[in-house]
From Swiss-Prot:
Binding site for substrate: 65-67, 78, 82-84
InterPro entries linked: dUTPase, dUTPase-like, dUTPase-like_sf, dUTPase_trimeric
Name recorded for this polypeptide: Deoxyuridine 5'-triphosphate nucleotidohydrolase
Native organism taxonomy: Bacteria, Pseudomonadati, Spirochaetota, Spirochaetia, Spirochaetales
Family: Belongs to the dUTPase family.
Length: 146
């Protein structure tokens, strides 16, 4: 098992897996000063009170929690958010409310999940052309919508 060093502010919650098979560890809101209200179509940057030291070659992806999306229309706006191995600041989660009613985020609420992933770096090489494929330049919807 890979160990990731974490600094957790007093009163904040350590990232935690809910089940043995969970791929994402829940991140909780760190709001000791009181709750935040997210209006419909509004967005808010929610602190977690957690800083991590990821080994080079790993990243942390900040992903939505399915229950928040289903029940309230609340999701992570820049999903997945990326925490790079050289970032040492507090993890903050950009939530957006796509629902019809205001949503309140309170201290300790589970707001996102953190998934650790390997990073493969490549060298981009300038070229005058790239190989042709059957798909070609077909983009959004080119292979069918449903």
């Amino acid at each position: 098992m890979i160990r990731v060093r974490a600094v957790v502010y007093p009163g904040a919650s350590f990232p935690e897996y809910q089940t043995l098979g969970s791929s994402g560890a829940d991140l909780r809101a760190f709001l000791p000063g009181g709750p935040l209200e997210v209006h419909p179509l509004g967005r808010v940057l929610v602190p977690t009170g957690v800083c991590v030291e990821l080994p080079v070659g790993l990243e942390m992806q900040i992903r939505p929690r399915s229950g928040l999306a289903l029940e309230y229309g609340v999701t992570v706006l820049n999903s997945p958010g990326t925490i790079d191995a050289d970032y040492r600041g507090e993890i903050r989660v950009l939530l957006v409310n796509l629902g019809l009613a205001a949503f309140v985020v309170s201290h300790g609420d589970r707001i996102a999940q953190a998934v650790i992933s390997s990073v493969l770096r490549v060298e981009y090489v300038r070229s005058g052309s790239i190989s042709l494929t059957e798909r070609g330049k077909g983009g959004y919807g080119s292979t069918g919508v449903l």
